[in-house]
Amino acid sequence: VDTENLPKTWSEFREVCKQVTEAGKGKYYGMIEGGKQVNRLEIAIRALSCLAGSKSNDIGVISMVDGKNVLNSDAMIQAFDFYSGLVQDGSFHPDTVNLAAPEARALFAQNQAAFLIQGSWCISTWEKENPDLEFGVMEMPVPDDGAKGGLPYIGAQPWMGISKTSDNPELAAKYLQGLYSEEYQSGVVEDGGFVSAIKGVNEKYMKDGVMKDYYTLALEQGKLCPDPIVGNADASAVYANITEISPNLGQIVQGTLTGKTDYKDTLNTLAENTQKEWENGIKKAQEAGAEVSAEDFEFKNWNPLEDYTAEDYQNK
């Protein structure tokens, strides 16, 4: 792999993976992934489809375009075609579908693959456990005709709290204050494994060169997506009434990794059943008193090449 001229498009990436695999002769491959974890596979395929313009949003979030979900959109199928092409080329490590993410990370560190999709926590792990490993980070490759969106993420929702029945709420509060203090967060960032949510900490304390590259690329290619719950808090009542359809998106990717090529039909079935489940969830939420409709899950002013801002919610 020419590290000074990394593949930028799907075709270029596929060709490089093929070259690596052929040169490896069974010892190493172009790509490896933690294919046993279907949630990770869903994150990856959603990201790739968003680069193709699907507006599929972050994992666990339903977004609609023209009143329909995008699980079988042209962009989603393009993303599956890309993954399937890598599989048909033999470029995926043969153990991929049976590996958890830490196992894939370890095999990558043993030079059994040239590329994998994982998070920033790999950086400090490799530097500590595999000090001789030469590695770097790169942007996700985009469709040959250019990116039509960015890598999707949504703003963090509150996920830590103190129970009202806690015997020591003051102590719990002090713990949370300490956890998110600059003193503690600076150490986490300096260690090179994580990005802080506290304003200014990353810029001030991030020292690791690879981590800085990761942070820069994430800011450039990642795009904040609209969150229906931010637009209307009552949208949460819909999620509470939804039962996940099986096989889900990640499971369909998993099947593709084993060589299955009938994903178009499976995606059509997933999209159809998801639409029914979603419309039923909206109906149940409305019957329970929630002021919510299908329009709360569609954002016609969403440009997936840009961050979706508070002002965009107001002008939806």
Model-derived regions: residue spans:
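A local structural motif
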Residues: 1-5, 84-98, 112, 129-135
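Short, solvent-exposed loop/beta-turn-alpha elements that line the ligand-binding surface or hinge
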Residues: 6, 52-78, 128-129, 142-151, ...
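Extracytoplasmic/periplasmic solute-binding protein
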Residues: 11-68, 84, 113
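Extracytoplasmic/periplasmic substrate-recognition and gating elements
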Residues: 89-91, 128-200, 230-235, 251
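Alpha-to-beta junction loops
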Residues: 26-28, 110-119, 131-133
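Short helix-initiation/N-cap motifs at beta->coil->alpha
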Residues: 8-14, 95-109
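Long, aromatic- and glycine/proline-rich binding clefts that accommodate carbohydrate-like moieties
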Residues: 131, 138, 190-257, 290-316
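Glycine-centered hinge/linker elements that transmit conformational signals in sensory
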Residues: 14-19, 63-96, 140
